Amino acid sequence: MNARTRVGLVMLATLVATAAAAQPPAWPSATRYVDPVNGLSLEQAIAHALEQEPSLRAARTQIDVAQGMRMQSALRPNPTVSFERREEPQGMDNQTMVSLEWPLDLFRRDARVAVADRQVAAAELAVADRQRLLIANVRARYGDVLTVVRDLRLFDDLVAATGRQHDLLRARVDEGATAPLDRDLVTVELRRLESERVLQVGRAEAALIELKRVLGMQPDAALMVRDSLEDVVLRESAATASSANDASRIIEQRADVREAAAQVDIAGAKIERAEREGRFDVNVFANYARMNNGFPQLGVAPSGGLTPIRSVFHYVAAGATVTVPLRNHNQGEIAAARAEQNGAALTHEAARLAATTELAAARARDDYARQAVTIYSSGAQGLARHNLAVVEQSFQLGRVTVFDVLTERRRYIEVERGYTDALRGAFEARTALNQAIGEGR
């Protein structure tokens, strides 16, 4: 064996070792994230989030707060009881008095309760709106997972197919039937696809963690999804969104619009409360007094003897105190409440306009997104897959070059990713439509 041969063998061994070292580890495939039987469906994800998501649970406590304030507003003011004892220094006279004062709270209780009732209703509507937004967020995060998993499944298949082609070309090169360039071109393509696949795994992990967050789950909790992006989109396309034609009714039933209307009612109730608190009020009172009085001199008793001049006297009094609104009619609070009502009315008008615009835009987006999916699914996607299969078979028969296979494969990737974008657009459009309508699914 000459020196040139030995050098060649060393270089070949080095290349083989380098290629072996460059072999990627076994990354998770798309099946790692999908379980068609025991996985979490979209409906289950929404139900789980409505029950467990921490910020929604915190928002629900505001209803308890409002109900507690409602209970407090219905209570009458407490009566006042006073006790008084008077003693004469260096003497024997004394006086004991017990008084009771009872506020009548005229005109005020009903107004307080009316404000509190409307605040309870507003708190419930605020939670309902928070649920509406949470459902949309869960759908968005669930859709992110489905989108990335679909791309990952695509690259799983492409890596497997390209790997088989690479093995075939390597065998042909070893037999001398194919030029090494063809093998090297496929090797580069295989490494590119493997790199893209690894990136998709990272995106899938991140999307799954974000989904766990909106579900109220820890990042390390086990979670697999049940649905595929295509199944969800096609299922929702077959179902009719309950938007119908009555846009005005839909807008008025939305939780955020109703909450804005409730704020107008609260402001109106505050005006009534302020006006009633500016009226007169009456407190009734009563007291009992016992007086033990006398003089240091002695008097003559009926029997003719001397007796101390001292006696015990009992007094009972009753009356009423009236608060007269002579200068303070609560004018400032009434003016503030009216200004608050005007602001709440404008906020309600803005909420209705925003909801109307959101609904119209969501309907248009949903219609065109469904049409885009139909265009892809009615022929483009299947034809692209068929074209790739034909080119690959032609390559195996020696009718086309490896360049043709690589070109057609990249064209197929573009079509599949375009279909994924169309599916994702349709899913996001239906999410936006459901959010605009206020549907809980």
Give the location of each predicted region:
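Periplasmic alpha-helical coiled-coil/stalk elements that build and connect Gram-negative outer-membrane
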Residues: 3, 125-251, 365, 369, ...
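Small/polar, glycine/serine/threonine/aspartate-rich low-complexity segments that form flexible
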Residues: 26-38, 79-117, 228-238, 272, ...
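Terminal intrinsically disordered/low-complexity segments used for targeting and assembly
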Residues: 1-51, 201-249, 298-300, 434-441
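Amphipathic alpha-helical coiled-coil segments
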Residues: 58-70, 130, 134-155, 164-167, ...
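Metallo-beta-lactamase
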Residues: 200, 255, 422
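Amphipathic alpha-helical segments within well-ordered protein domains
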Residues: 46, 101, 167-170, 247-248, ...
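Amphipathic alpha-helical coiled-coil scaffold segments and their short linker/junction regions
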Residues: 35, 45-50, 178, 182-189, ...
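A glycine-/polar-enriched beta->alpha junction
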Residues: 47-57, 64-78, 98-115, 125-132, ...
